[in-house]
Regions:
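Compositionally biased, low-complexity flexible segments
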Residues: 1-29
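Nudix hydrolase/Nudix homology domain
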Residues: 29-31, 38-47, 107, 148, ...
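Conserved Nudix-box catalytic region and its N-terminal flanking loop in Nudix hydrolases
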Residues: 41, 78, 85-133, 175, ...
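Acidic, metal-coordinating catalytic segment for phosphate/diphosphate chemistry
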Residues: 48-85, 90, 99
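Short, well-ordered beta-strand micro-motif
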Residues: 62-64, 88, 167-169, 190-192
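A short, acidic/glycine-rich surface segment
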Residues: 72-73, 173-177
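Active-site segment of metal-dependent pyrophosphate-handling enzymes
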Residues: 81, 89, 101-102, 110-116, ...
Length: 247
């Protein structure tokens, strides 16, 4: 029997396959398979930045960018100093807060979190200092043990805000706690952490950072990794002056 050969284009029936569109989507591997891949075919170049509003701690600007094909577009950007989110684990319970969020016009159940303060020299507060401060201000507790879990962009489509996530254990009430900041109205909620995770899995918690934190907590519990790593404790009142100066 003669050896079989692969069919040539002239042997195939039907129309030839359409060539790939030069401006169409390309499918590339991600994860470890992306090692060594170039980003140049995806990169946008900023050719102009225009600030349209400077707020207390955020700046709004409109950028003109040039895409990989040389076409120009506008991008609306929110500059943000970054933020922290804390998972306060009190035995088998987690501490959360309920507060009104004007953009969504409703009360939201969340993990304690807050924006990094501006420093006197124009810099930004270190996340490792901001996390204990926010925990103290929003819950009235301090933690004996801290573990930084990771960080993530909250909405990279329009803001550079980078959220730093922490696990806080060994909680103790602050002796001199006087409640949250004067412009914050919060309810402190304590519930079994497994119940909070269940609410997240059922779609009853819709805050993104809280979903990330609770599902991360569940993954740690599955692996028996809930023990924290001791770090220097920071008094909850530290850097409060920086916040008032910003306000």
């Amino acid at each position: 029997m003669p050896a079989r050969t692969a069919p040539t284009a002239s042997d195939r029936t039907g129309p030839p396959p359409a060539p790939p569109r030069p401006d169409g989507p390309t499918h590339t591997a991600i994860g470890p398979y992306a090692a060594g891949m170039s980003d140049e075919h995806l990169k946008e170049t900023t050719v102009e930045r225009r600030v349209v509003h400077e707020g207390r701690f955020m700046t709004f600007r409109v950028d003109t960018i040039e895409d990989p094909q040389g076409k120009r577009h506008t991008r609306e950007i929110v500059e943000h100093p970054g933020a922290v989110c804390v998972i306060p684990l009190h035995g088998e319970d987690v501490l959360m807060v309920r507060q009104w969020r004007t953009p969504v016009e409703r009360v939201v159940l969340e993990l304690p979190a807050g924006t990094l303060d501006r420093t006197a020299d124009g810099g930004v507060e270190a996340p490792d200092l901001a996390a204990p401060r926010e925990l103290g201000e929003e819950t009235g507790y301090r933690a004996a043990s801290w573990r930084k879990l990771g960080r993530f962009w909250t909405a990279p489509g329009f803001t550079e805000e980078l959220m730093h996530l922490y696990l806080a254990t060994g909680l103790e009430p602050l002796a001199d706690y006087r409640g949250p900041d004067v412009d914050e109205y919060l309810d402190l909620v304590r519930m079994p952490w497994r119940e909070a995770v269940a609410l997240a899995e059922q779609g009853r918690i819709e805050d993104a950072k809280t979903l990330v934190g609770l599902l991360w907590l569940a993954r740690l519990a599955e692996g028996g990794e809930l023990a924290g790593k001791p770090v220097a404790q920071v008094d909850a009142r530290q850097s409060r002056a920086g916040r008032h100066a910003r306000d």
